[in-house]
Design a protein with these regions (language model features):
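Hydrophobic faces of well-ordered beta-strands that scaffold small-molecule active sites
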Residues: 1, 24-26, 54-58, 81-89, ...
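Active-site-proximal loop/turn and secondary-structure-junction residues that shape catalytic pockets
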Residues: 30-32, 60-63, 89-91, 128-130, ...
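Active-site-adjacent beta->alpha loops and helix N-cap segments on the catalytic face
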Residues: 33-41, 65, 95-106, 131-135, ...
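Active-site core of metal-dependent hydrolases
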Residues: 108-169
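Active-site gating/metal-coordination segments in enzymes
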Residues: 64-121, 153-155
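Generic detector of short, locally flexible boundary/turn motifs and exposed helical patches
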Residues: 19-23, 50-55, 86-91, 114-120, ...
């Protein structure tokens, strides 16, 4: 987020080993342009080949999602390492998906998780914008989509919302 020279370098296996980490889930952040789900999957496969357990998420902060197969559901269904999707909400760097787009996305993730037997998570980078995770809590309250598919992050600045979300299930 400061030019090409500030790009985050690729993760190194030695960092996991020296930290005692045995399982990783890789994901893309803001930069879904110079990095891609394909490159992330290649790194995930390399880590698995090096002896650590590694999974990854398709997409980055953006909506519509950038995938390998053309759909989030197919990425989850047909690529063993992919267990869900990354997305940003409530952030100046997000694509501001609508409620209906979020419902459609998490529904696709849910169906893929049911068919594949995978967890099927929507990993949500939550920024500092005022709406916070209210759109997600509204979806949980007003649909039959289980809360277990939503994984919001960066909630330290939103402790009351985090508490409400936790009590929802």
């Amino acid at each position: 987020e400061g030019g090409f020279e500030t790009r985050t370098p690729e993760f190194q296996l030695s960092k996991a080993v020296t930290s005692g980490v045995t399982t990783l889930v890789g994901l893309l952040g803001t930069d879904g342009y110079t990095k891609s789900p394909e490159l992330l999957l290649a790194k995930t496969k390399a880590l698995n080949n090096e002896g650590i357990t590694a999974y990854c998420l398709t997409n980055s902060y953006a909506y519509p999602p950038r995938t390998i197969t053309g759909s989030v559901a197919n990425d989850i269904l047909y690529i063993s390492e992919i267990i869900g999707c990354k997305l940003a909400i409530a952030d100046h760097r997000c694509s501001h998906p609508t409620r209906d787009e979020l419902i459609r996305l998490v529904s696709d993730i849910r169906m893929a998780s049911l068919v594949s037997g995978k967890v099927g998570e929507l990993h949500l980078h939550v920024g500092a914008s005022p709406e916070g995770i209210e759109p997600i809590m509204d979806i949980v309250r007003t649909t039959d989509i289980p809360i277990s598919h939503f994984r919001p992050t960066h909630l330290g600045r939103r402790l009351e919302e985090a508490s409400q979300f936790t009590h929802m299930g």
